[in-house]
Design a protein with these regions (language model features):
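Structured catalytic core of nucleotide-sugar glycosyltransferases
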Residues: 1-133
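Short conserved micro-motifs on helix faces and helix-strand junctions that flank
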Residues: 14, 72-74, 119, 165, ...
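Generic structural signal for secondary-structure transition and capping sites
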Residues: 31-34, 94, 120, 153, ...
Length: 327
């Protein structure tokens, strides 16, 4: 397929308080995209921003009919924003990228070129080869998370993988068919399969503004990823319970034998309290793990929508073909 073949490319951009960096992002894309010689559609998703992000999106919409925006009634999270963007995107190729310019717009050319030259490919993803500019502990934690996921999850999650990718319509339709409320897009992209080629690039620092992701949020997001794509925590709970039971039986046997042979029972409140606290800690750990999985089931049974729209540009409702209905 030639690069000049006319097709629609939808670019989905989740936004949360991106007032400072959004003009730089939009200008960078507008300067590059005409060279693609293809029809472009922007789908900006305002995830309940409290700054001037929505006003900027409205201004871009007035200037450019290719710009569409969706504004949530509150902050529902990046996963909901990605899902909404995928639902409303109409392109033959769909791009997901962040507005902070850490996803280099110039890579769109290479992505499309790879797909055009390899008709058997369904998706071009991206991976960061370095994390320069990030705090050491945050970078170390990210590397540890990916290594852990590769060990405990049946789904292959490449180290450093980003949400930044270009997908064919077939991949998007497959992702939209997954209707769970608790979403972890990196895992979902991998779970649906399809042939994916990864482009590597070094870390790019945020160009303006501040990230909305704190370390605490990233930590709990990683927990969501582990819970959603692995039963390993349940195995840990089972093994911990089995081990504590074995140790308790062993200690009981030791106390009984010592009493029968030496004639004096083992004394000492310190050792007794240590054992009680240890077993209590194991119990609380396992209850917490079970509770986390049960809470996931509870949230799914509510069948609440992933997001609510406060306002949007004159985007048509997503077509019946792509509309996901809950059973």
């Amino acid at each position: 397929m030639d690069l000049k073949t006319k097709m629609m490319i939808s670019i989905i951009v989740p936004c949360l308080n991106e007032e400072e960096v959004l003009p730089l992002f939009y200008q960078a894309l507008e300067a590059l995209l005409p060279d693609l010689e293809t029809e472009i559609e922007y789908v900006f998703v305002d995830d309940g921003s409290s700054d001037g992000t929505l006003e900027l999106l409205k201004a871009y919409r007035e200037q450019n009919p290719a710009v569409h925006y969706i504004s949530f009634s509150r902050n529902f999270g990046k996963e909901a924003a990605l899902y909404a963007g995928l639902q409303y995107a109409t392109g033959d190729l769909v791009v997901v990228m962040d507005a902070d310019l850490q996803d280099p717009p110039s890579m769109l050319f290479e992505m499309k070129n790879v797909l055009d030259k390899n008709v058997d490919l369904d998706c071009v993803g991206t991976r960061r080869t370095s994390r320069e500019g990030e705090p050491f502990f945050r970078s170390f934690s990210a590397v540890l998370f990916y290594r852990l996921m590769q060990k405990i999850s049946p789904v292959a999650l490449p180290s450093g993988v980003r949400d930044f990718r270009m997908m064919r319509r077939s991949v998007v339709d497959a992702i939209l068919s997954l209707t769970e409320s608790n979403r972890f897009s990196k895992g979902l992209f991998a779970w649906v399969g399809f042939k994916t080629y990864y482009l590597d690039y070094p870390n790019v620092e945020r160009q303006a503004g501040k990230t909305s992701w704190s370390f605490r949020q990233l930590f709990f997001y990683s927990i969501e990823g582990i819970i959603n794509f692995s039963d390993f925590p349940l195995i840990i709970a089972f093994v911990a319970g089995l081990l504590s039971c074995f140790l308790s039986l062993l200690m009981t046997f030791f106390v009984v034998v010592r009493t029968l042979i030496l004639g004096n029972p083992t004394s000492g409140w310190t050792s007794l309290m240590a054992v009680i606290l240890f077993l209590g800690g194991i119990q609380l750990l396992t209850i917490g793990i079970f509770g986390k999985y049960i809470s996931k089931i509870y949230l799914e049974t509510k069948k609440r929508p992933l997001y609510l729209i406060k306002e949007k540009s004159d985007l048509p409702d997503f077509t019946e073909k792509n509309k996901v209905k809950r059973l």
